[in-house]
Amino acid sequence: MLSHNTMVKQRKQQASAIMKEIHGNDVDVMHLGKKVSIPRDIMLEELSHLSNRGARLFKMRQRRSDKYTFENFQYETKAQINHNIAMQNEKLDGINLESGSQQAPFTPPNTPDPRSPPNPENIAPGYSGPLKEIPPERFNTTAVPKYYQSPWEQAISNDPELLEALYPKFFKPEGKAELPDYRSFNRVATPFGGFEKASKMVKFKVPDFDLLLLTDPRFMAFANPLSGRRSFNRTPKGWISENIPIVITTEPTEDNTIPESEDL
């Protein structure tokens, strides 16, 4: 088993190797060419300065990783020591089991012998048989639930008015009362004595209107002077304005060619 100082030294060596890998080692560096090595050198040089925010964040992360590495060293060493102790205990237990394998297996007390048949007295002492003297339970019976009745309800149970006051009920609509049969005078005005005895001296005759005048075109033109004005709100029509049907004949047309002159 390694001593504590030796483990501390090994841990520090591992931490220094990790830090060398992070910061870079000029001795063991693979030559990757100018396109890779020069930008990497520029990037590492920029990160080494604390002029920009990215470099400051990079330094903070480096310090945090170093702090985590050295602070967790004590916890990891304790865990490793506990693991080694557990491994030694397991080895000792294995040696003890090998040495005691020739002894008889340990059985807990009050365990029945599996070679003998089971005895009811041993399994459940005091049990003689099924309980035949006790009547069986009756199922499918309606159980009446018991409810609590307060002393106030018991005191006013004989007084219905108090019960109604204790448990208010909703109001029910009352029936409509029958309206009295009054005589209505809201009628058409009638002359005294009725229409038969009314005076017939004044007679009104509805004048006769000549409805033909309303349809007279002269009256319509006079009533609407804009009716004779030309309207341009018309639908588009074809080349033939009179809507004459076109007749297509299959007979050969006559040769109406114009004779050419001598100049042509």
From Swiss-Prot:
Compartments, record wording: Cytoplasm, Myofibril, Sarcomere, Z line
Primary residence: cytoplasm
Modified residues (Phosphoserine): 101, 116
Single GO molecular function: telethonin binding
Record key words, sorted: Cytoplasm, Methylation, Phosphoprotein
Omega-N-methylarginine: residues bearing it: 53
Superkingdom, natural source: Eukaryota
Comp. bias regions, Pro residues: 106-120
Chain positions with Phosphothreonine modification: 107, 111
UniProt-annotated stretches for the region Disordered: 98-134
Function: Myozenins may serve as intracellular binding proteins involved in linking Z line proteins such as alpha-actinin, gamma-filamin, TCAP/telethonin, LDB3/ZASP and localizing calcineurin signaling to the sarcomere. Plays an important role in the modulation of calcineurin signaling. May play a role in myofibrillogenesis.
Subunit structure: Interacts via its C-terminus with spectrin repeats 3 and 4 of ACTN2. Interacts with ACTN1, LDB3, MYOT and PPP3CA.
Family statement: Belongs to the myozenin family.
Protein name: Myozenin-2
Source taxonomy: Eukaryota, Metazoa, Chordata, Craniata, Vertebrata
